Amino acid sequence: MKATFNSWDGKYRQPFGAIQAGTSVKWSVAIDEEVQEVTLWLTKINEDDMAYPMTYNSETKMYETSIRIGTSGLYYYYFNIKQNNQYYFLQRARDQFGEAELTQDSTDVRTFQLTCYDRQVPQEPWYAQGVVYQIFPDRFNNGNPHGEITGRKKNSFLYATPEDTPYYIKDEHGAMARWDFFGGNLKGITEKVPYLKKLGVTAIYLNPIFMASSNHRYDTQDFMKIDPMLGTEQDLQELIQTLHDNKMHLILDGVFNHVGADSKYFLKATQDKNSDYFSWFNFIHYPDKYQSWWGVTTLPEVNKHNKQYVNYITGPKGVLAKWTKMQVDGWRLDVADELPMEFLRAIRDRLQKENCQLVIGEVWEDASHKFVNSEFRPYMAGDNLTGVMNYPMRNLIINLLQAKDEAGEISAMNDLEKLVENYPKAFLENCLNNIGTHDTERIKTVLGGDEELVAMAFGLMFAAPGVPCIYYGDEAGLIGGKDPDNRRCFPWGKESHFLEETVSMLARARKANPALVSGKVGFVKIRLGINALVRYNDREIVVYCYNRTNEDVDLDASEMRTYCLPEMIADLVRDLLDQEVIAKKDFLLKKADMMEKEESK
């Protein structure tokens, strides 16, 4: 018996991908032999399995059923087939782009996922169509006239030159003895806006800028003050004004899960149980034993269910309101998966009231099926986050460029397919793609120092759905291992012009081709080390093809295997790539106008 289902093929499932609550979904299964019955098993998380009999349609020669999905949430499904009084399970095939396979093993059936949301998240054109640049403020640029460092912190360590390699200064117990600084500041960022604009950047995302002891500033001392080493509120206003004058935007980092142990909030809580801040924290043994972030005692965790704290962050005179009123354009939320859903909704609500629509959460996994303490987190419902940092995209890009065989490459492509299928379209297009951040090794280091591979990684990031985000210095060829080595100073005057020009070209291509922003997605497998990512809409097809081998290659349509592409689009892509020469360790972007193709038929 052969049974066929493919969640990417409209013959078998309509509509494709994530759906809005209230949508009717049609499932169809083709079976080449007579069977007794076919059943769709559909499960919503935390609810009982539901069985839906499928009816044979003599016209389509398929077993079919249509079901209205009334409420948002996370659903899983598979099919049960009865033949000769034996049961078969039609499950998701591994790394096969939505295809299904039969099994009689009922112990671990691989299900298909169905994401259901209440409403699509808003898409700000400046963001969805743009290019973001992440800056770790202390390590980017010092804009003071003579490079002097202002607002120096007591007992801190200042490096002699920007070329120095950062390291942590710890005591015999492994605790930080001194925090180290290079002296980058807000004026320095403002000074480099022309560089960023030339690169093609349209928005910058800053790691935390509020008052703190450390160089990373995830240990907030005071949410209402700019860190003196970075500058003043006036410096921030000047940066925002300069960005807006250049049609660029600003995203700030909100760290609302924990504060610094030397913050005004925690210090007052430890000094007085009658303090307004005492209830913000969970003391195990007052005052020296308390709940902290992952056991890091310098980062006491805040009780996010505390109404006073929530109001301090999200109230009309709170932290978000204060800074967003200065025309901040969006927020990234640190460790969003540790913030309660009601807190995330309160954050979103406050920002909407301040006319700010962008709330990006730090979530490292596929955010469509994220669980925290066995509780499902409905990030895609439409009422909390509007996107997440796309670390799965980083992982699959690296896997594509390091795969030892074609099976590894197909697996990486399939990982992208899962994101496209699991995420609502607008949510995916709002995700912040990256190939490196302050929490990862530098992409050039990961790829063995090979700048041609780094260029291909940039190309994949720009060609994939989501907003490309460049980690400062990656485009300059900066290297770095794990934290703190990945936080070196920007190498002004020693940049890789090859990578800078690559990024600038990709930014121009993304701006010129709407398919790279909101087009559908498909893949082409040619041979080991040579693959293509396809984006298309009703007007154009854009193909990003890379060759990571050490040979120039004449592309041959007969070698091309396409995935997740309608037959007509697949044929056009083959025509577009056929007989093209792709140089070794290089990539190419090819475009075809759909209207011209239609007229030429």
Residue positions per predicted region:
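Carbohydrate-binding surface patches
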Residues: Q14-F16, V524-M560
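Surface-exposed beta-strand/loop patches in extracellular or lumenal glycoproteins
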Residues: K26-D32, V38, T549-Y563
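Conserved, mostly hydrophobic/aromatic
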Residues: V29, I135, L196, L206, ...
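Glycan-association/targeting regions that enable binding to alpha-glucans and other polysaccharides
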Residues: M1-A128
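Aromatic/acidic polysaccharide-binding cleft in carbohydrate-active enzymes
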Residues: D138, V372-S374, P378-G387, E429, ...
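Substrate-binding/active-site clefts of carbohydrate-active enzymes
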Residues: F136-A203, I209-M326, A346-K353, H369-K370, ...
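Active-site-proximal helices and loops of the catalytic beta/alpha 8
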Residues: I240-H249, H258, S263-K273, V319, ...
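C-terminal beta-strand-rich structural cap/linker in extracellular carbohydrate-active enzymes
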Residues: I31-E33, V131, A570-K601
